[in-house]
Each structure stands twice: as C-alpha cells, then as structure tokens.
A protein has these predicted regions:
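Small-residue (Gly/Pro/Ala) motifs that create kinks and tight helix-helix packing interfaces
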Residues: 36, 71, 165-173
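Cytoplasmic helix-loop-helix junction between adjacent transmembrane helices
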Residues: 121-157
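Helix-to-loop junctions at the C-terminal end of transmembrane segments
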Residues: 66-80, 173
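Residue-level signature of mid-helix packing/kink "hotspots" within the transmembrane helices
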Residues: 61-69, 162-163, 167
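Helix-loop boundary and gating motifs at the non-cytosolic
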Residues: 3-65
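C-terminal ends and interior cores of transmembrane alpha-helices
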Residues: 90-111
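Short hydrophobic/alpha-helical segments at membrane-entry points of transmembrane helices
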Residues: 16-17, 108-110, 114-122
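Cytoplasmic membrane-interface "Motif A"-like loop-to-helix N-cap segments
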Residues: 76-90
Length: 173
C-alpha cells in the first residue's frame, strides 16, 4: 500500500488529474454552498420565497440533465483530449461576472425578464459547474485507467477541496 501511494505521487497524470479536480471542486464549493442562502436572504441576497428557489433549482436540474448528455456525447468523440474540459473551465471562470452583471439583475427584475434570467442562468451554471462535475469525474476516471492510478484516490481530492473551501467560506461569511 505504501509503495502504491508513493508511486502515485510520482505519476504526473495522477498529480494533474488530482490537482484539476481539486481546483474544480474548490471553485464550485466557494459559491454553491451559499447559493440557496443568496437566493432567499432578504438582507444580503435576493429575498426569494422557497417556491421561487425551488423553481430555480428545478430548472437548473433539468438543464444539467440535458447538458450532461451533450457533454457525454462530445467527450466520447474526443477520448482523453481535454478540449471540452478547457471549454468548461472557461465557462466556470465566467460564472462570477455573469452572476454579478447578468443573472442577479435579471432575477431581481421580475416578470418575463426574471424567467429569461432563470433559463439563461440554468444554462450557464449547469454548463460551467453542475454538468461539468460529471465530465471532470469521467475524464479523471479515464485518465486513471490509461495512466495507472487509483480513481478514488484522485477523486477524493475533489471532495477534500469542496469541504475545505466551504468550511473557510463559512467562517468568512
């Protein structure tokens, strides 16, 4: 067991995959753990009702299901190439400005603008994070088979990253 762990640290594919999934889950955990609170908090958030929050979560889930199938089909064609991962990373990097300058104003506008904002937000948030999670995990699993390291050990870094960032953000906010 000790030799397997020692050899994992010498495997550059393990290190890259572990670091990539760690950073992805860190970036997801910093905002997703507070998304519900942001939607419902009347003082520092949008002050939505539980029903409105549920609608947003439902539409996000539907968009995630559709985008996951699209990502899966595209990634099956790409094999182990990271082009789709780079695209998802770019979308994920744009989530902060999108929420600040597009999503929040549309959600607070009400009416048809709010509904369009919910739809647009479900596509962006799902494309960048919620559906992207499955792709990052699938790529890591493919790399683990191809380059000889334990997927579970690499995936654990993602869970660790999410937990650490959510804990730190909880203390800060």
């Amino acid at each position: 067991m000790a030799s397997a762990t020692k050899s994992a640290w010498k495997n550059p594919s393990y290190l890259q995959s572990s670091f990539g999934i760690f950073m992805f889950f860190c970036s997801w955990g910093i905002w997703w753990s507070f998304f519900s609170r942001w939607l419902t908090d009347p003082t520092h958030g949008l002050g939505m009702s539980s029903a409105e929050q549920g609608q947003i979560y439902s539409i996000n889930s539907l968009a995630t299901l559709v985008i996951m199938f699209v990502y899966g089909t595209i990634q099956d064609q790409l094999g182990i190439k990271r082009k789709l991962v780079i695209f998802i990373s770019a979308v994920a990097a744009c989530v902060g400005p999108f929420v600040q300058f597009v999503y929040q104003p549309m959600l607070t506008a009400g009416g048809t603008t709010r509904f369009i904002g919910v739809l647009l937000g479900s596509i962006v948030l799902s494309a960048g994070f919620m559906a992207g999670c499955s792709l990052f995990e699938a790529i890591t699993e493919r790399y683990s088979r191809k380059f000889g390291f334990e997927y579970g050990q690499s995936r654990a870094w993602g869970s660790f990253g999410y937990a650490v960032v959510a804990l730190c953000a909880g203390f800060l906010f």
